[in-house]
Amino acid sequence: MAATEGTVVVKIGTSSLTDMQTGSLRLSVLGPLVEVLTRLRSQGYAVILVSSGAVGIGCARLGLRQRPTAIAEKQAVAAVGQGRLIRLYDDLFSALNQPIAQVLLTRGDFVERSRYVNANRTFTQLLQMGVIPIVNENDTVAVEELKFGDNDSLSALVASMVQAKWLILLTDVDRLYSADPHRDPSAEPIERVWRGMPLQIKAEAHGNSGWGTGGMATKLAAAQIATAAGVTVVITNGKRPDQIPAILAGEPIGTRFEPAPQPVSARKRWIAYGLIPEGSLTLDEGAVRAICEQGRSLLPAGITDVSGDFEAGAAVRLCDPGGREVGRGLVNYSAEELRRIKGKKTAEIPYILGYEGVDTAVHRDNLALLD
């Protein structure tokens, strides 16, 4: 049946999928999860599952007692585990007559615009066909500098790409806390978060399992990416996938991150979160106000420092005088050129560079602000 209720992206992590001691799969979690997602599909939702677990399952299959750290070994183990993982999903979903598809992505699929657009078209077609795509990072071929590092970021980028209505992050705690509830009995639960709301939490204290790569800090970063795209994000207990329908019905389960009232355009989301910055520009206070409060382009006169080695067209971080990142943009000049014209007036640029360049270092159409 056609999806009429919007798209739901569900991400389940290694800590929820596998036993922390042995790395073996928890069928007590997988079975109910498959049933819930199939039911949502029959109720008119388009569903995408982002599933970790390939490395953990590969470790269990090969008798490894801890996650490998060497890149080549980790990629080999992922290749072993991914086949077993998707086979199990196919067996479980097939029992309910629900077709699935395996979609393996790398960061390069988001960095290169043509691949990004093509991946989006593939997701759209699969969802129109009533298929549940099961997504994971392609660990076997991903190079270190183009890795997501965790599936929280991947799930947020997928949710943004397909303009999902919901992103459900299933984890090993029932909601976000001010500190790790496993270690700190005074940890306070946080039920709702709005964009721009200051969070007094020790994100790193939530940690992560020995088999996974994510922690609570990565989930907060994922929430920032997804909510900027207008996606509602919920962090909740991965051992209770049966609660997902209640969450979609509006019940206060887990921690809910409210979406931006005015979602950022697809192109600017791609600039802000899809691309990998190759350097950074430090701006003076006047330039920060101009781009953040007045929506203006960045002029060379407002740049005080240039870091990195990049060419024109590269993505860079835009930082305030204190080093806080306020945005990202595509530069009109190389790093070497920007070092020569930083702090200079526009009229001086042709004399410094020896040719007539553009007025802006980063045009506002190629500039995306961050919270």
Swiss-Prot record:
Q: Name one GO cellular component term.
A: cytosol
Annotated disulfide bonds: none
Identify the main location. cytoplasm
Stretch forming the signal peptide: none
Presence of the UniProt keyword Transmembrane helix in the record: no
Cite the EC number: 2.7.2.11
Q: Which residues form the PUA domain?
A: 278-356
Compartment(s):
Cytoplasm
Keyword annotations for this protein, in alphabetical order, are:
Amino-acid biosynthesis, ATP-binding, Cytoplasm, Kinase, Nucleotide-binding, Proline biosynthesis, Transferase
| Keyword match Plastid | no
Q: Which GO terms describe its molecular function?
A: ATP binding; glutamate 5-kinase activity; RNA binding
List the InterPro entries: AceGlu_kinase-like_sf, Asp/Glu/Uridylate_kinase, G5K_ProB, Glu/AcGlu_kinase, Glu_5kinase, Glu_5kinase/COase_Synthase, Glutamate_5-kinase_CS, PUA
Give the residues the record marks as binding ATP.
11, 171-172, 213-219
- Catalytic reaction equation(s): L-glutamate + ATP = L-glutamyl 5-phosphate + ADP
Q: Which GO terms describe its biological process?
A: L-proline biosynthetic process
Q: Provide the residue positions that the database annotates as binding substrate.
A: 52, 139, 151
Q: Which CDD domains does the UniProt record give?
A: AAK_G5K_ProB, PUA_G5K
Among PANTHER family, the record links this protein to: GLUTAMATE 5-KINASE
This chain's function reads: Catalyzes the transfer of a phosphate group to glutamate to form L-glutamate 5-phosphate.
Which family is this protein grouped under? Belongs to the glutamate 5-kinase family.
Entry protein name: Glutamate 5-kinase
Organism for this UniProt entry: Synechococcus sp. (strain JA-3-3Ab) (Cyanobacteria bacterium Yellowstone A-Prime)
The uppermost taxa in this organism's lineage are:
Bacteria, Bacillati, Cyanobacteriota, Cyanophyceae, Synechococcales
> What gene is it encoded by?
proB
